[in-house]
């Protein structure tokens, strides 16, 4: 006992010191970011008065300018240049030059960059959310959940664990190489390209940027033409934080444009990250194949939401509605297929109907609305076509939410929260990605049936399984083909930033987030060196030195069994043979050569 007391005292003292150090706030400088232009309500300035503004929608875009509007009100926000391929290549070249300097930076400096960003985000949550709301139509609460919390979680994870997972990692050397030390090193790739969507403009920029910059890379991000206004403001935050730590200019860049701009980016960088539709993802792959550029594709989703009869119906109903209506249903990992056990089917529909009836949609910054606008005007027509197809094939509308006061020019930007019942897999709503506030509910009888239904999709991003038995929920989830699974919850995986995120099938491949996503930004290099240099070096055994001996293959046979044989006695017997070969070889070689 006396032997352990000093160790216990030291451990206790260490814990106390660590706790006291936590009470000392880190020295993190503040940054100033000009937000005067994004706080104005709409742009009716003389500068932009000559531009034709279509009465509705964003489909009429100039080839040379990216025109920006508020989806919720259709107020004009301004325009940004659509970069040419030559301009894109110039931006990548500048980032590549800056990256060579940044690759030598310390993790201490990189962590300070993250802390500066985190401090600014926490202190300017309302500004960041309002900008996102204006550019995408989502509510402030939806922006806080999807933009602020997810980004802060990623920064916090990188601060606490990022360096650990980028340091050289020791690996076992195996039986044949016991005299060697093996490790894996993680080096920056160079310049990473990212093409990101409009649904969460703040997080979609910060997510790849944080991983790329922390791992020593430069990054050029093409923002969506439907969220360029917010993307260019968020870029100012990154620029200010980089300048505060003395990072080289142009390390990070945000570019605007259309397909031509994105294609040029794919052919210019060392790795591509694409988040978007399956159709565009296939185009990215084809273009990347020309230069053998590695790609990570996070594409569409049609997540299954499974509710067993032993689940808490009232609790699950709240989660289900949030999973459907968050950001007006415009989520990559969105709940799009609901499978409810027949014994609780009616009860679940009743609970969901009650909640959805209380939901109102409207311009998020003009009143207290639960749900905002649809970002793309033409998408409302697509959503209605999915509903009509289901109704034509026997489905029914259980309930639809209500609208607040909508401006005439923005009426097509909204779609009511809709619950469909009596649906089946013959309907498009259960097969095509909706990306909207529609909840189609289908009943099932057995676990085997619901697993088959959940896997009957070309998409395979995520799933959620609810059951009073955790074991049962885990058993069901383990048999569903997808990259992300939540037990008795929905989409909680994304708030666990140590976890990789991505899917299979038409939902893409590769992973971002977590250890796997961080290391995906790296050149993964295997390194082997002598363990006892210079005392023990690798030496070619005499039997297989050139010119090889007559019994070289017999030597190899004995060596293989010595190293890998399953029976210890056979291995020892073979070891004796190996030693004989090594000691007798010189005379054997001599006799062999003389005979010729």
Swiss-Prot record:
A Pfam entry, by short name: Aldedh
- According to its UniProt record, the EC number is 1.2.1.3
Write down the top EC class of this protein. Answer: oxidoreductase
Q: In which tissues is it expressed?
A: Constituively expressed at low levels.
Q: A single GO CC term, please?
A: extracellular region
What induces or represses this gene?
Answer: Not induced by abscisic acid (ABA), dehydration and salt stress.
Residues bound to NAD(+): 276-281
**What family name appears in the similarity comment?**
Belongs to the aldehyde dehydrogenase family.
Record-given protein name: Aldehyde dehydrogenase 22A1
Q: Which organism is it from?
A: Arabidopsis thaliana
């Amino acid at each position: 006992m006396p032997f352990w007391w000093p160790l216990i005292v030291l451990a206790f003292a260490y814990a106390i010191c660590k706790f006291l150090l936590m009470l000392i706030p880190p020295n993190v400088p503040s940054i100033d970011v000009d937000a005067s232009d994004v706080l104005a309500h709409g742009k009716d300035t003389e500068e932009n008065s000559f531009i034709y503004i279509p009465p509705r929608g964003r489909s009429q875009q100039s080839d040379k300018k990216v025109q920006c509007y508020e989806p919720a009100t259709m107020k004009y926000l301004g325009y940004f240049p659509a970069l040419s391929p030559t301009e894109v290549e110039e931006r990548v070249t500048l980032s590549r030059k800056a990256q060579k300097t940044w690759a030598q930076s310390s993790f201490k400096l990189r962590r300070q960059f993250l802390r500066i960003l985190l401090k600014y985000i926490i202190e300017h949550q309302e500004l960041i959310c309002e900008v996102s709301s204006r550019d995408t139509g989502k509510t402030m609460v939806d922006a806080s959940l999807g933009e602020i919390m997810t980004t802060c979680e990623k920064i916090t994870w990188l601060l606490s664990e990022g360096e650990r997972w980028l340091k050289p990692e020791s690996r076992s050397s195996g039986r044949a190489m016991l005299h060697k030390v093996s490790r894996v090193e993680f080096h920056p790739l160079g310049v990473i390209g990212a093409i990101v969507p409009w649904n969460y403009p703040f997080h979609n920029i910060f997510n790849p940027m944080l991983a790329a910059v922390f791992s020593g890379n430069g990054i050029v991000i093409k923002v969506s033409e439907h969220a360029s206004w917010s993307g260019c403001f968020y870029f100012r935050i990154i620029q200010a934080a980089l300048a505060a730590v003395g990072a080289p200019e142009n390390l990070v860049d945000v570019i605007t444009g259309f397909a031509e701009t994105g294609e040029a980016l794919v052919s210019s960088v060392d790795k591509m990250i694409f988040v978007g539709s399956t159709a565009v993802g296939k185009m990215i792959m084809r273009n990347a194949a020309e230069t053998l550029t590695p790609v990570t594709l996070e594409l569409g989703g049609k997540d299954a939401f499974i509710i067993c009869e032993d689940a808490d119906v009232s609790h699950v109903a709240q989660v289900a509605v949030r999973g459907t209506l968050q950001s007006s249903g415009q989520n990559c990992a969105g709940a799009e297929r609901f499978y409810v056990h027949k014994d609780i089917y009616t009860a679940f529909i009743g609970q969901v109907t009650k909640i959805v009836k209380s939901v109102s949609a409207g311009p998020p910054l003009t009143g207290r609305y639960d749900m905002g606008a649809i970002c793309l005007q033409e998408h409302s027509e697509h959503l209605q076509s999915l509903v009509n197809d289901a109704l034509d094939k026997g489905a029914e509308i259980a309930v639809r939410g209500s609208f607040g006061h909508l401006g005439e020019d923005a009426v097509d930007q909204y779609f009511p929260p809709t619950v469909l019942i009596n649906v089946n897999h013959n309907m498009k709503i259960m097969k095509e990605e909706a990306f909207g506030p529609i909840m189609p509910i289908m009943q099932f009888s057995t676990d085997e049936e619901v697993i088959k239904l959940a896997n009957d999709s070309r998409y395979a991003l995520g799933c959620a399984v609810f059951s009073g038995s955790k074991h049962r929920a885990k058993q069901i989830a383990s048999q569903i083909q997808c990259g992300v699974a939540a037990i008795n919850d929905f989409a909680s995986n994304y708030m666990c930033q140590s976890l990789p995120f991505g899917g299979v099938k038409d939902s893409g491949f590769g992973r971002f987030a977590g250890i796997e996503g961080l290391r995906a930004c790296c050149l993964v290099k295997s390194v082997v060196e002598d363990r006892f240099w210079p005392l023990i070096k690798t030496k070619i055994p005499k039997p297989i030195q050139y010119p090889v001996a007559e019994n070289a293959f017999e030597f190899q046979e004995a060596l293989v069994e010595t190293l890998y044989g399953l029976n210890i006695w056979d291995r020892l017997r073979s070891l004796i043979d190996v030693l004989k070969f090594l000691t007798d070889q010189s005379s054997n070689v001599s006799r062999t050569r003389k005979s010729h």
